[in-house]
A protein has these predicted regions:
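Terminal substrate-recognition subdomain of acyl/acetyltransferases
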Residues: 51-172
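A conserved beta-strand-loop-helix scaffold within acyl/acetyltransferase catalytic domains
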Residues: 1-32, 50, 67
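Conserved glycine-rich acetyl-CoA-binding loop
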Residues: 30-41
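Eukaryote-skewed repeat-based solenoidal scaffolds used as protein-protein interaction platforms
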Residues: 40-51
């Protein structure tokens, strides 16, 4: 795309409690007509790195979001938490706590809503949808308690199974 920077991400691959994890600490995509393609490319790179590091394992992907648009980045994952109509069980809430601690925002984290009330924007997934009208109302409702002006974020995580990771992370 004309040799210019259109997006950047800082992420880590690590094991949290023995489980392979991709932590998307910071991702930003320039507001342009190609932003969907840029987001897809950044996520493909994250999945490729995960595939190389954890080829036969299910992987957790976690990030912080300030707006519902960012959920687009996670659309390939299964069992995304939080999600509307689903009450998170103990292990799902535990993952939220682990991620909050790893992102160093656990002091202001609410494990029931997965919301960091303030001071949570030291890094987050910054993406503005090219089709905001297509974002489902149930996704938007997850962000009702997120006060971006105070630095609030929603901690979101989901899984990619080993067989899905092979497809998501391949460079075909």
């Amino acid at each position: 795309m004309d040799g210019k920077l259109h997006g950047v991400t800082f992420s880590t691959l690590e094991r949290i409690g023995g489980t392979p994890c991709v932590l998307l600490g910071l991702m930003t995509v320039k507001r342009s007509s190609k932003r969907d393609q840029v987001l897809k490319g950044l996520m493909a790179e994250a999945y490729h790195r995960a595939l190389m590091a954890f080829p036969d394992e299910d992987v957790v992907v976690g990030t912080r979001l300030v707006a519902p648009d960012g959920m687009e980045a996670l659309k390939s994952l299964t069992e995304i938490i939080p999600r509307t109509g689903h009450r998170a069980v103990g292990e799902e809430r535990a993952w939220g706590r682990r991620l909050a601690k790893r992102f160093a925002v656990d002091a202001n984290y609410d494990e029931q809503s997965f919301v960091v009330k303030s001071a949570g924007q030291s890094g987050f997934l910054d993406y503005e949808s090219s089709k905001p009208e297509k974002i489902k109302p149930e996704i938007v409702s997850l962000f009702n308690d997120v006060n971006a002006k105070k630095g609030g974020v929603l901690i979101v995580h989901g899984w990619t199974m080993a067989e899905s990771l092979v497809k998501l992370g391949s460079r075909a």
